[in-house]
């Protein structure tokens, strides 16, 4: 077999520039002919003919001169070129001078391999007419009878066949050199001279550099424009053209770091070459094709071994760097964006639907950076557990679009922010909360007057539309309200009543005691005791219009739990003791009282930190802001005599206190007595899905209990039951068996009735959850035959109830919560009652509870006066007792503020985040700014991080807000190196907030240094304290997870002892 050196000696290259002619457009063109002749076989000649103008020669001269200067540093040896002139350019002398200079330039390049192998010369002859030796009979000029006939041929005849064949002559060394240049960011010969491979000629060899001087003649000849093995006849070149196209695509994919696709194209090209070479007649050409085929096959195998996808038996192993190379078919053209329809905007991403498959995705756009950096390698993870999946990506001229999985559960903080003691201004994205400068307290009592039932009917019908998901913003204190960004918008809030003047811009005093002092100092205005019609009861007569208004809105859906519960409300008017109930009209004084800060008045009972997550019943009743329903009072009617009621109103003005301090535990909203008993329900928050699920179980016992005897009815049940307890289940529907739904029944709110009378209707609410933290929240609605209603903590410590509602109506009661306040007229603190009138105001409070209520002392601050002779009345204690009331409220608030998310849930969430971060670190990705906005939930309640990737064309950025809130490690944004330890700090900051209920920056506003001791409440376990302390180390080298063992140090920490890591990896 002949060597490259021998073949190079056999080839001679000749260039001629002839026949200058005037182009129809007015400029002069020259015919350029390039011939390659074999010295051993002079008949073996190949020829290319192109027509060029002066500007083309000038451009080629400049490019070849630059290459020659970089190689030899002797620019004076390079042939000069004629200068361009405007006038006289059509003179024969000027044309001849230009023709001669062009011919000298081409002939000079024929003797230097770096020039005749250059891409510039290849582009110069692209599009020319190719002639073989059999066609070269006679002079070459015989092919162009006229200039006009030749130009169309030049434009239609391509030079692709020659370049395709040349692409097959690239040796494996040049390919390796190109790949090494991309991997090590070194300047390859192509980039040294500022040259780039185009898609048409990317397989051509690079321009020779200084290092190429040491290469053998064989290597340089392999990249020749006219290879040693001359082309076969036109009829036999089809397989070479197809194979050349595939090799070009393979090189292009290698440049894009898509090695899997490159290997595929290499193998397809090899298959074509092996199939086509079987019919090759020339032994020299056959050997050349086989040699190149072997080199391409070796290249494909080396790519597969280095970047191939894992085998099937390796699927169970943790994801490594192999998963960061996405399948080449994940990339889609920019035109595919037309197939997506935008459904909404969620934070900074789009919720879209693929119109072809009707599937929902998240579309995230990454803006390309103006500075392209080869230092950043593109890493596109696709096998990271507990992180949203990438379906495809689309690269446009300005952006990279990621089509991601939609985490249907939304953000974790959307659900747990209710239990984090953060004020609205401290939430991640919250609007300003203004404060009023003056507030009023209104006391209103029932009075006798005729009243129609129109407003009651409208209220009753509106109850059907109130059955929305519970909001999660209003909580124990204003500091726990959170308005962080939501992943799951779209849930409408309950419609506000027309006469509702309530506003979310309420002010809070610093203490109930302060409120009490102010209340005692103010003078009650006598003129404010305005008479107002309230209720009408006429013997045994029944207001059929008022009664019919109840079932009017219940017939729509008799299967829902809300409808089943309302069905029992129809029994509020039994046949043996019917009473007509109508609704009051809204007075001006009531409308003015809407802006009173007292309308948030409540005490929330939250027990130990070991309780599972749930919404306390008190917040269900009193967290919403719209006009409350006025109470209805029905008295035992022994003689069927008609009852009438008087309404009086007292007004107290006081200055609002200063704005509460951020994170203050004793800051509680001020609520009017009027609004305390019957809080409004229309101010539901938008976009707040509730994890509570209403279970329709055990409703049969409700019907039986309601049917056992005559039932009394109060509007309290309407306002609470219809508008608070009944909500639609959210996406996190928990599948619990009937046995799991059984728990201790909890007593309800009893209406104001004779203790010796028939049993009253009651509602019970259950708050419990499974021990498995994945089953987050459960709420059930039930009924009991007891005359009282409350939410009691279960005797099982795993199922301790939240938000205990208690009632105190009899002397032997062991509960406290239902307060009957007699507001005496003329300031006399004495009991006033008669058979005709009763002036009372009802205030319902939630108080703290222990697990065993039977052991409690009766602690009702306002109880039914047992010494009163047979009269249904209530006694208001003196000023001293009122003072003690508010002191007790402050103490109970401090106890309620100690509620935290159970560590069992946090442990599960933390373990899932550790697995996700470890997988990202194996891919080579450091999140740096992991914060609550990156923590999502799937439809089953498991953690899913937002998608993290790295792109060479996209500049790495860090969330400035996360840095300010100390979710980022101290070294982020500094001059020190950012390592994987940054993410372990972020994990510690997130866990700190989950465990303590406050953000890290709130507890340590001055930052954390090497000697900082973290402030954590006593309820946090020692294991959790140790974990947080080790994660939040100022020195990244001392941080847990930054040692030699890496993430194994975190997994082996005692806090994660119950975690089955093997199960999480599945």
Swiss-Prot record:
Cystine crosslinks: none
GO biological process, one term: signal transduction
Phosphoserine modification, residue list: 282, 423, 427, 449, 455, 494, 528, 583, 605, 608, 640, 661, 664, 667, 794, 872
Result when mutating residue 663 to A: In an ovarian mucinous carcinoma sample; somatic mutation
Cellular component terms (Gene Ontology): early endosome; endosome; lysosome; membrane
Effect the entry attributes to changing residue 1003 to Y: In a lung adenocarcinoma sample; somatic mutation
Tissues where this protein is expressed: Highly expressed in testis, skeletal muscle, brain, heart, placenta, kidney and liver and weakly expressed in thymus, small intestine, lung and colon.
Residues at the catalytic site: 929 (proton acceptor)
Domain (Protein kinase): residue spans on this chain: 344-445, 794-1056
Alphabetical UniProt keywords: ATP-binding, Cytoplasm, Endosome, Kinase, Lipid-binding, Membrane, Nucleotide-binding, Phosphoprotein, Repeat, Serine/threonine-protein kinase, Transferase
Location in the cell: Cytoplasm; Membrane; Early endosome
Biased composition (Polar residues): 474-483
Main subcellular localisation: cytoplasm
Domain PX: 8-132
Residues engaged in binding ATP: 801-809, 820
Gene3D superfamilies membership: Phosphotransferase system, lactose/cellobiose-type IIA subunit, Phox-like domain, Transferase(Phosphotransferase) domain 1
SMART domains in the cross-refs: MIT (SM00745), PX (SM00312), S_TKc (SM00220)
SUPFAM superfamilies: MIT domain, Protein kinase-like (PK-like), PX domain
GO MF term set: ATP binding; phosphatidylinositol binding; protein serine kinase activity; protein serine/threonine kinase activity
Family: Belongs to the protein kinase superfamily. Ser/Thr protein kinase family. S6 kinase subfamily.
Subunit structure: Interacts with SPHK1 and phosphatidylinositol 3-phosphate. Interacts (via PX domain) with PRDX3.
Name of the featured protein: Ribosomal protein S6 kinase delta-1
Species assigned in the record: Homo sapiens
Gene giving rise to this polypeptide: RPS6KC1
């Amino acid at each position: 077999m002949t060597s490259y050196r021998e073949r190079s000696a056999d080839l001679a290259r000749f260039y001629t520039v002839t026949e200058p002619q005037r182009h129809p457009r007015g400029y002069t063109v020259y015919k350029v002919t390039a011939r390659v002749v074999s010295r051993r076989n002079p008949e073996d000649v190949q020829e290319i003919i192109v027509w060029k103008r002066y500007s083309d020669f000038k451009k080629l001269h400049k490019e070849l001169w630059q290459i020659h200067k970089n190689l030899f540093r002797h620019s004076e040896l390079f042939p000069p070129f004629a200068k361009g002139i405007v006038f006289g350019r059509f003179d024969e002398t000027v044309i001849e001078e230009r023709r001669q200079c062009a011919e000298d330039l081409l002939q000079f390049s024929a003797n230097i391999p770096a020039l005749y192998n250059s891409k510039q010369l290849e582009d110069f002859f692209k599009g020319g007419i190719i002639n073989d030796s059999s066609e070269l009979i006679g002079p070459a000029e015989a092919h162009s009878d006229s200039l006009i006939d030749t130009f169309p041929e030049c434009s239609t005849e391509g030079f692709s066949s020659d370049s395709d064949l040349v692409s097959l002559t690239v040796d494996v060394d040049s390919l390796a050199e190109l790949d090494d240049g991309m991997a090590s960011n070194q300047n390859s010969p192509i980039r040294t001279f500022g040259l780039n491979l185009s898609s048409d000629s990317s397989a051509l060899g690079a321009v020779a550099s200084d290092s190429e001087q040491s290469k053998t003649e064989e290597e340089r000849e392999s990249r020749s424009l006219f290879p040693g093995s001359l082309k076969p006849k036109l009829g036999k070149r089809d397989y070479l053209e197809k194979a050349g196209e595939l090799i070009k695509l393979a090189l292009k994919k290698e440049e894009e770091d898509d090695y899997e696709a490159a290997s595929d194209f290499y193998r397809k090209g090899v298959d074509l070459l092996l199939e086509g070479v079987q019919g090759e007649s020339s032994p020299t050409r056959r050997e050349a094709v086989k040699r190149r085929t072997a080199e391409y096959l070796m290249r494909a195998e080396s790519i597969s071994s280095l970047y191939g996808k894992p085998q099937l038996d390796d699927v169970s192993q943790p994801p490594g760097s192999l998963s960061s190379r996405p399948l080449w078919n994940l990339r889609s053209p920019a035109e595919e964006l037309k197939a997506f329809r935008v459904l909404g905007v969620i934070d900074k991403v789009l919720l879209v639907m693929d119109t072809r498959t009707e599937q929902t995705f998240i579309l995230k756009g990454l803006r390309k950076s103006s500075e392209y950096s080869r230092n950043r390698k593109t890493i596109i993870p696709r096998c990271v557990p507990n992180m949203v999946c990438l379906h495809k990506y689309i690269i446009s001229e300005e952006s990279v679009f990621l089509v991601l999985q939609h985490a249907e559960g939304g953000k974790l903080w959307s659900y747990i922010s209710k239990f984090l003691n953060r004020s609205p201004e401290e939430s991640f994205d919250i609007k300003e909360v203004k404060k009023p400068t003056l507030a009023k307290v209104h006391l209103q009592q029932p009075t006798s007057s005729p009243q129609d039932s129109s407003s009651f009917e409208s209220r009753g019908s509106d109850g059907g539309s109130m059955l929305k998901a519970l909001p999660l913003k209003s909580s124990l204190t204003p500091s726990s309200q959170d308005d962080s960004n939501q992943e799951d918008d779209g849930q409408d809030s309950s419609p506000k009543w027309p006469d509702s003047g309530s506003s979310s811009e309420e002010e809070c005093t610093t203490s109930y005691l302060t409120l009490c002092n102010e209340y005692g100092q103010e003078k009650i205005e006598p003129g404010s005791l305005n008479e107002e019609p309230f209720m009408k009861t006429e013997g045994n007569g029944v207001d059929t219009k008022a009664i019919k208004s109840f079932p009017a809105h219940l017939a729509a859906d008799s299967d829902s739990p809300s409808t089943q519960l309302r069905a029992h409300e129809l029994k509020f008017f039994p046949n043996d003791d019917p009473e007509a109930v109508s609704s009051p009209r809204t007075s001006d004084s009531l409308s003015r009282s809407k802006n009173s800060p007292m309308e948030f008045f409540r005490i929330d009972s939250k027990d130990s930190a070991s309780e599972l997550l749930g919404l306390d019943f008190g917040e269900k009743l009193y967290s919403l802001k719209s006009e409350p329903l006025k109470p209805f009072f029905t008295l035992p009617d022994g003689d069927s005599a008609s009852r009438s009621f008087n309404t009086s109103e007292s007004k107290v003005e006081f200055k609002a206190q200063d704005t509460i301090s951020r994170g203050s535990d004793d800051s509680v909203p001020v609520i009017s007595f009027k609004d305390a008993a019957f809080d409004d329900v229309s101010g539901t928050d938008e976009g707040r899905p509730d994890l509570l699920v209403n279970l329709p179980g055990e409703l049969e016992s409700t019907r039986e209990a309601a049917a056992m005897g005559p039932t009394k009815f109060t509007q309290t049940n309407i306002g609470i039951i219809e508008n608070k307890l009944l909500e639609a289940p959210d996406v996190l529907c928990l599948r619990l068996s009937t046995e799991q739904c059984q728990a201790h029944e909890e007593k309800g709110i009893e209406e104001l009735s004779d203790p010796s009378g028939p049993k009253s209707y009651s509602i019970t609410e259950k708050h419990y959850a499974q021990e498995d933290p994945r089953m987050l929240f459960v709420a059930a609605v039930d009924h009991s035959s007891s005359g009282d209603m409350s939410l009691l903590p279960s005797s099982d410590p795993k199922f301790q109830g939240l938000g205990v509602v208690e009632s105190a109506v009899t002397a032997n009661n062991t509960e406290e919560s239902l307060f009957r306040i007699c507001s005496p007229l003329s300031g006399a603190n004495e009991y006033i009652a008669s058979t005709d009138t009763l002036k009372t105001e009802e205030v319902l409070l939630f108080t703290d509870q222990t697990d065993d209520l039977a052991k409690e002392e009766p602690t009702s601050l306002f109880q039914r006066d047992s010494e009163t002779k047979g009269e249904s009345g209530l006694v208001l204690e003196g000023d001293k007792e009122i003072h003690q009331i508010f002191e007790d409220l402050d103490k109970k608030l401090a106890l309620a503020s100690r509620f935290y998310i159970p560590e069992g849930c946090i442990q599960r969430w933390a373990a899932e985040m550790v697995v996700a971060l470890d997988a990202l670190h194996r891919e080579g990705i450091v999140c740096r700014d992991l914060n609550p906005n990156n923590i999502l939930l799937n439809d089953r309640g498991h953690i899913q991080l937002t998608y993290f990737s790295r792109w060479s064309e996209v500049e790495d950025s860090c969330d400035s807000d996360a840095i300010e809130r100390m979710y980022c490690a101290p070294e982020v944004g500094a001059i020190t190196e950012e390592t994987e330890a940054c993410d372990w700090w972020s994990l510690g900051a997130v866990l700190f907030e989950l465990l303590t209920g406050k953000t890290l920056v709130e507890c340590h506003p001055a930052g954390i240094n090497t000697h900082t001791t973290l402030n954590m409440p006593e309820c946090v376990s020692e294991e959790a304290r140790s974990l947080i302390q080790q994660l939040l180390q100022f020195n990244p080298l001392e941080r847990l997870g930054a040692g030699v063992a890496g993430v194994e140090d975190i997994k082996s920490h005692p806090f994660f002892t119950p975690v089955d890591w093997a199960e999480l990896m599945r």
